[in-house]
Regions:
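Non-catalytic accessory regions flanking glycosidase/transglycosidase catalytic cores in CAZymes
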Residues: 1-173
């Protein structure tokens, strides 16, 4: 039989506290009806559920990862920017449901700011392209003086719609 002995006196390295972050995905009621529920008496003017924020704040998550999991492999971020009422609905390929795209990039970044955590965005490595991923990084982190890979999706678009510098970490799938 194998045994494991934990020696609390022997330090072999440190862990980056970001490994203790959180994760949200468009699965079941995690987003819609979970953290985001427009028109609910439990939500603020942005649609963020206050009871959920109150439960999450004490966790002091260093990062929050989105759109995460299987969902991101079919998610195209440009569907989730611009005026909410003009965003296209799509089939959620991972979970076989309808995705309204009412909770998108700007809502996620604002949610993280409200929660006091660092946003961590996962790019689509399934049905997406490297250019799409680069354009998303430029949209979030660009200053408006960069040359976007897609002229309709760069920082200049975010800034023209009144958005501020978003700044986020990016990871793949």
């Amino acid at each position: 039989m194998a045994k494991i002995k934990v020696d609390l006196e022997r330090e072999i390295g440190t862990l980056d506290r970001r490994v203790f972050g959180g994760f949200i995905e468009h699965l079941g009621r995690c987003i819609y009806g979970g953290i985001f529920d427009e028109g609910s008496g439990l939500s603020d003017e942005h649609g963020y559920r206050q009871d959920v924020l109150d439960a999450l704040r004490p966790l002091r998550m260093p990062v929050l990862r989105w759109p995460g999991g299987n969902f991101v492999s079919g998610y195209h971020w440009t569907d989730g920017i611009g005026p909410r009422d003009e965003r296209p609905g799509r089939n959620n390929l991972a979970w076989r449901s309808e995705e309204s795209n009412r909770f998108g990039t700007d809502e996620f970044i604002e949610y993280c700011r409200t929660l006091g955590t660092e946003p961590y965005i996962c790019v689509n490595m399934g049905t997406g392209t490297m250019d799409e991923a680069a354009a998303w990084v430029e949209y979030c982190n660009g200053t408006g003086d960069t040359t976007p890979r897609s002229p309709t999706c760069g920082a200049s678009r975010r800034l023209s719609e009144g958005g501020s510098l978003l700044r986020q970490r990016v990871g793949r799938g």
